[in-house]
A protein has these predicted regions:
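A membrane-interface helix-boundary motif in multi-pass transporters
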Residues: 39-42, 75-78, 158-177
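A late C-terminal transmembrane helix in Major Facilitator Superfamily
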Residues: 58, 126-164
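Conserved glycine-rich helix-kink/hinge and helix-boundary motifs of the Major Facilitator Superfamily
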Residues: 11, 44, 48, 81, ...
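Interfacial helix-cap and linker-helix signal at transmembrane-aqueous boundaries
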Residues: 32-33, 64-65, 69, 156-165
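Cytoplasmic membrane-interface "Motif A"-like loop-to-helix N-cap segments
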Residues: 67-83
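Multi-pass alpha-helical transporter architecture, strongest
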Residues: 93-97, 171-205
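Hydrophobic core of transmembrane alpha-helices in multi-pass small-molecule transporters
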Residues: 101-116
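Extracytoplasmic gate region of multi-pass secondary transporters
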Residues: 4-61, 114-122, 149-154
């Protein structure tokens, strides 16, 4: 697992992208309370709608990845890169705008594709690892998502918001998606090489050595 550059890059890229999605999910109720003057109940409901958008988007982006990656698996990597750049664009524009309906709409659109990398990342790990280690591979992906994304994101943005304010911290947050896109691009550059190596590793154990062939002939004789 850990000798494949594409797999390691997928872990890191997926984690960094969840840095963005996880941060918005955690801090959005507080953001709505501070900058929209919403009470806790209303902010919680609206934040839940945004989370729902990200959940639906994750499924639809995964379906799109399956559709376009059927005959060309590395297209899934390209889609993951597109999701990173798209979410960065939408969220950057959203948090550059003043509070209002337009901003909320753009946040929903950004979150719709922000978690869209979940599907392609899982598919890439499945394609690049042997069946015998799939459980370990997916557990490591989950660890990377939690460590680099869902845990680290809210922590860093929270610390940053104490210094420059939550709104300004949110303005910087989407830039992490650019890092995620760059890491996925690195994975794409090594994807075919790692696939070929995995195929060789699967075929070679099934090949009989000349010594085994001679031994069988002697046994038959």
């Amino acid at each position: 697992i850990y000798s494949s550059r594409s797999v390691i890059a997928t872990y890191i890229g997926s984690g960094f992208q969840l840095f963005v999605g996880g941060t918005v999910i955690v801090w959005m109720p507080s953001y709505l309370n501070r900058y929209y003057g919403m009470n806790t109940d209303t902010a919680g409901v609206l934040a839940a709608v945004i989370v729902l958008c990200s959940a639906v988007g994750s499924i639809l982006c995964g379906m799109l990845s399956d559709r376009f990656g059927q005959n060309c698996p590395d297209r899934k990597v390209s889609l993951a890169i597109s999701y990173c750049i798209g979410s960065c664009l939408f969220l950057s524009i959203a948090f550059a705008m003043p509070a209002g309906k337009s901003q909320l709409l753009l946040i929903c659109m950004g979150m719709f594709i922000a978690l869209g990398t979940n599907g392609p990342s899982s598919a890439m790990v499945a394609n690049l690892t042997h069946n015998s280690v799939h459980s370990t591979a997916f557990a490591t992906l989950t660890l990377a998502n939690n460590l680099l994304g869902l845990a680290l994101g809210p922590l860093i943005i929270g610390k940053l918001s104490d210094v420059i304010g939550l709104h300004h911290a949110f303005q910087l947050m989407p830039l992490v998606s650019i890092i995620a896109a760059a890491v996925f691009l690195y994975a794409k550059n090594h994807y075919h090489q790692d696939i070929a190596r995995l195929t060789d590793q699967a075929v070679l154990p099934n090949l009989e050595s000349p010594v085994d062939v001679m031994r069988k002939k002697n046994d038959d004789a």
